Amino acid sequence: VGDVAIEELKVGGSIRLKGPLRARSIKAGGSFHVDGDLEVEQLEVGGLCRIDGDLKAREVIVGGSIKTSRSVVVEKLFKVGGSANIGGDLRAGEVRVGGSIEAKAIYAEIFKLGGRANIEKVEAKHVEIDRNSEVRGLVFGCRVVVGKGAEVKGVIGHDVVVEKDAEVDRVEALKVKVEKGAEVDELYYVQEAQIDKDAKVSKAIKVDKLSVELKCEEL
């Protein structure tokens, strides 16, 4: 079948379709599988979503897990309650992940993680790594909050907060706050570093500028 266009599709259970597929709205209560590319305005899947190709959408909400073989571009919200496995890059207005996400790179305005991310990098204006979450990769953001007990490989940001008992290998920031019990191996700051007396920072060095230029409005 060639390029199939669907106005609205509602499935209570599971469905498998051949792509490339274009649709306005797809809602599947169980699992949804497309052999090929999918372009859709609204995609809602209660269980498992699998796209063997590229995914382009206005909004994606998945209660369970999503797997794509290639890249994902979402204009507004990309929200996953369980796990997301993206074969290429993920670009979205807002990314919210409750469980785990794996992708090459993530580009968004807002990135909120409540679990684990295995990625090369995240670039977002606003980044929130929730309590006890883990990021295996680099985080670039205008404002970055590493929540209590979270673990992150590296952060480069304008305004960075490392909350209580969080661990970050390397931080570069214009302004940074490191709370009680937090651990940072290497800290580089341009303007200001507030380090709690009970935080563990192996080395803190004032530098002239960040190693990467971030596009942010002045704080």
Which residues fall in each region the model found?
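Intrinsically disordered, low-complexity terminal regions
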Residues: V1-L219
